[in-house]
Amino acid sequence: MNRRRPSAPAPHLETGNRGERRALEHLTGQGLELLECNFRCRAGEIDLIMRDGEVVVFVEVRVRTHPGYGGALASITPAKQRRLARAAARWLQRHRLTQRAVCRFDVVTFDGERPQWLRHAFTAPG
């Protein structure tokens, strides 16, 4: 019988998970409340969904360990922004908040050890 041992997560996934945990710590330390982690749907994925007062905040977390790949913020292309906006719309529909929700898209980047929190990083396209 051939038994497989559980494999360790890929290094880039572990880096991303660690970044999401650190971003969550930072944002909750700033007074935001966690609504959901790693929301997935056909439209895409949202790393963190938070509440900042009455505002629903969709957060993309980016970690860059090597400057040769470009900065963390530069990796959020217009196509990625569209996917995030579509996933956010699905989340709002599922929670019946489409008509009354005030939302924003934030980005937390790690180009080193310290987080950089960019509020209103982009607006939903379309």
UniProtKB/Swiss-Prot annotation:
Taxonomic superkingdom: Bacteria
Family matches, as SUPFAM superfamilies: Restriction endonuclease-like
InterPro entries xref list: Restrct_endonuc-II-like (IPR011335), tRNA_endonuc-like_dom_sf (IPR011856), UPF0102_YraN-like (IPR003509)
Gene3D superfamilies, A to Z: 3.40.1350.10
GO molecular function (one): nucleic acid binding
Similarity comment: Belongs to the UPF0102 family.
NCBIfam families recorded: PRK12497.1-3, YraN family protein
Protein name, as recorded: UPF0102 protein Mlg_2205
Species this chain originates from: Alkalilimnicola ehrlichii (strain ATCC BAA-1101 / DSM 17681 / MLHE-1)
